[in-house]
Amino acid sequence: MQVSRVLAALCGMLLCASGLFAASGDFCDSSLCLNGGTCLTGQDNDIYCLCPEGFTGLVCNETERGPCSPNPCYNDAKCLVTLDTQRGDIFTEYICQCPVGYSGIHCETETNYYNLDGEYMFTTAVPNTAVPTPAPTPDLSNNLASRCSTQLGMEGGAIADSQISASSVYMGFMGLQRWGPELARLYRTGIVNAWTASNYDSKPWIQVNLLRKMRVSGVMTQGASRAGRAEYLKTFKVAYSLDGRKFEFIQDESGGDKEFLGNLDNNSLKVNMFNPTLEAQYIKLYPVSCHRGCTLRFELLGCELHGCSEPLGLKNNTIPDSQMSASSSYKTWNLRAFGWYPHLGRLDNQGKINAWTAQSNSAKEWLQVDLGTQRQVTGIITQGARDFGHIQYVASYKVAHSDDGVQWTVYEEQGSSKVFQGNLDNNSHKKNIFEKPFMARYVRVLPVSWHNRITLRLELLGC
């Protein structure tokens, strides 16, 4: 009797809370709010996050001690709080200052060179104060070696939810919490922030469809915390396939299925590299032993088969500001200090004003990158941004290229200009690979459709 009263009271509170939320606005994508926050839209379609107890900030990303406590960065990286309290995207208000030899949003990736067989060659980064140790320089022009440890898109969103599947899903909290495969993204936050297999699944697996044959060189895994307790994969196997039907397991030295060591807690990162690398379209992870539940967040590492898919320098500022230009630039409140200039249109750029936005919503607008010299361009990654809470992005676009910046060729496939699918939100990465890579010094992105304003952050891929 007492139990039923407690359940009735709990249900009453849930119904009351849901009524309060509904009165405050319509529900929106919960992934926009971190740490289990509830996403609502206001009368002007502005995004609001109702934060759970213990969290605050625009997207429920801060604790009372600030976004750098505990330190979200890896490999002894320093967490720096940004000066702006209001930012142009939904990332937490910090950046990770990576030590030499590491890169990534959280300094999680070791910047090493691997040859096409996945064998370690040498570390690319050398401290300024150190004397460089002679090492063979990879001849990228002949494809003798290639840096093949790029994140393939689980964390950034280039791998869409529809590309991720699993054998089963755990349903928690009276069936209201779905720990689905689309949540198994590295560093995902929130109360429900990972994939967990059903307790009744004796042979669980999670699969990623890369949509094309790629070279896969490794995997990074994380556990998660469910109901306040750590859960993670202690060991797992990896299988791969070209057609999604016939799978082969990675083998160990004795010819048996190789078991990879997983994690030791719910949050630390574990990196396993494959030697040799895999050529596959489908990758499956099979948990072998788990701590409490089989709960996983992960990222795949690799590159295109041709080995020519490295970032060309927008995100890491190798391409200087002077080599980025645009047809026009929007200024918030018509103030130059709040200009969304072309040099801001760099992938994952952060800050209150952190992207390029065109002055007008017109198909005549463009964003241009001067690569400095002629390069082979094989792909592009795009991203939107937010202007004081307003989500803005390019939904579709064309690409043009030139050798002299005067005569332009619009990229074509099957005899007509190709319209690429762009973004669906302000934060996720959208990666498009060119079926016909081209040589060019200048590249332009030509928006075709957009949401709110033409707003863009990007990276070009190639070699």
Swiss-Prot record:
Keywords: Angiogenesis, Cell adhesion, Cytoplasmic vesicle, Disulfide bond, EGF-like domain, Fertilization, Glycoprotein, Membrane, Repeat, Secreted, Signal
Any matching Pfam family: F5_F8_type_C
One Gene Ontology term from the biological process aspect of the record: single fertilization
Disulfide links within the chain: C28-C39, C33-C49, C51-C60, C68-C79, C73-C96, C98-C107, C148-C303, C290-C294, C308-C463
Record domain EGF-like: where: 24-61, 64-108
SUPFAM superfamilies: EGF/Laminin (SSF57196), Galactose-binding domain-like (SSF49785)
UniProt short sequence motif Cell attachment site, positions renumbered to this chain: 87-89
SMART domains: EGF, FA58C
GO cellular component: acrosomal membrane; collagen-containing extracellular matrix; external side of plasma membrane; extracellular space
Gene Ontology molecular functions: integrin binding; phosphatidylethanolamine binding; phosphatidylserine binding
PTM info: N-glycosylated. Isoform 1 also exists in both an O-glycosylated and a non-O-glycosylated form.
Record keyword Coiled coil present: no
Induction of its expression: Isoform 1 is induced by insulin, prolactin and hydrocortisone in mammary epithelial cells. Expression of isoform 2 is repressed by the same treatment.
Expression sites (tissue/organ): Mammary epithelial cell surfaces and spermatozoan. Isoform 2 is present in brain, heart, kidney and spleen and at low levels in lung, liver, small intestine and testis.
PROSITE patterns in the cross-refs: EGF_1, EGF_2, EGF_3, FA58C_1, FA58C_2, FA58C_3
InterPro entries: EGF-like_dom (IPR000742), FA58C (IPR000421), Galactose-bd-like_sf (IPR008979), Neuropilin_MCO_CoagFactor (IPR050633)
Domain F5/8 type C: 148-303, 308-463
Residues modified by glycosylation: N61, N266, N316, N426
Secretion signal, residue range per the UniProt entry: 1-22
Function comment: Contributes to phagocytic removal of apoptotic cells in many tissues. Specific ligand for the alpha-v/beta-3 and alpha-v/beta-5 receptors. Also binds to phosphatidylserine-enriched cell surfaces in a receptor-independent manner. Zona pellucida-binding protein which may play a role in gamete interaction. Plays an important role in the maintenance of intestinal epithelial homeostasis and the promotion of mucosal healing. Promotes VEGF-dependent neovascularization.
Domain notes: The F5/8 type C 2 domain mediates high-affinity binding to phosphatidylserine-containing membranes.
Entry protein name: Lactadherin
Organism expressing this protein natively: Mus musculus
